[in-house]
């Protein structure tokens, strides 16, 4: 009885066949975990920025409202008068203070209306459209606020110190309460300016992370 011997012949793979095959499991590149970690950290960072934005926005609205109410209710009448004159000072005697009240009312209204958009940024931290709208409107608000605060600060300075070259007398020695209230309103408006600038910087920082 003959025994058949099986001969095994090993055929080497060609380079073309070896290129078409890839291992099923292999270690990911070193940069993949870092990229995934950055993608996970971005929403958390933006949500933190949005929460801080909301706090600053409410604080700025409070400062702007305080400036508006303080200036809008500023009036003082001196206890003495003559037969023809009564010595009285009111914010609407000066167009600059009237502009201040109108401008700060607009800024206050905008800041209150922008709070829902800030809440949307907390709920959807990766959304760029609400953040872009806020940074544009915040820039307009800080411009209006700065113009009103700067113009009123010049009038308050003249009320305290006068101008000898123009023969403008200081009135704060007589109208002390009037000057204190207008000065407080101007200080509150500059606080709102600083907070609005921080809001613009925060929005720009959040957009940069996109």
Curated annotation (Swiss-Prot):
Transmembrane in keyword set: yes
Stretches in topological domain Cytoplasmic: 1-48, 120-138, 205-210
Region (Disordered): 1-25
GO CC, alphabetical: plasma membrane
Main function: Regulates membrane-cell wall junctions and localized cell wall deposition. Required for establishment of the Casparian strip membrane domain (CSD) and the subsequent formation of Casparian strips, a cell wall modification of the root endodermis that determines an apoplastic barrier between the intraorganismal apoplasm and the extraorganismal apoplasm and prevents lateral diffusion.
Subunit structure: Homodimer and heterodimers.
Name this protein carries in UniProt: Casparian strip membrane protein 1
């Amino acid at each position: 009885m003959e025994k058949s011997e099986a001969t095994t012949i090993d055929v080497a793979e060609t380079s073309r066949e070896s290129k078409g095959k890839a291992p099923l499991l292999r270690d990911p590149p070193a940069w993949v975990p870092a990229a995934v970690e950055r993608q996970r950290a971005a929403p958390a960072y933006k949500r933190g920025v949005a929460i801080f934005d909301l706090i600053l926005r409410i604080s700025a609205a409070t400062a702007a409202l305080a400036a508006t109410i303080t200036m809008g209710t500023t009036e003082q009448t001196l206890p003495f008068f003559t037969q023809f004159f009564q010595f009285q000072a009111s914010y609407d005697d000066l167009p600059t203070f009237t502009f201040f009240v109108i401008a700060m009312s607009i800024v206050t209204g905008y800041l209150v209306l922008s709070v829902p958009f800030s809440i949307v940024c907390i709920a959807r931290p990766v959304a760029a459209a609400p953040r872009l709208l806020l940074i544009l409107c915040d820039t307009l608000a800080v411009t209006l606020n700065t113009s009103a605060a700067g113009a009123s600060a010049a009038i308050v300075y003249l009320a305290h110190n006068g101008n000898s070259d123009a023969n403008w007398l200081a009135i704060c020695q007589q109208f002390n309460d009037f000057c204190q209230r207008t000065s407080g309103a101007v200080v509150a408006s500059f606080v709102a300016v600083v907070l609005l600038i921080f809001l613009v910087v925060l929005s720009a920082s959040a957009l940069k992370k996109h």
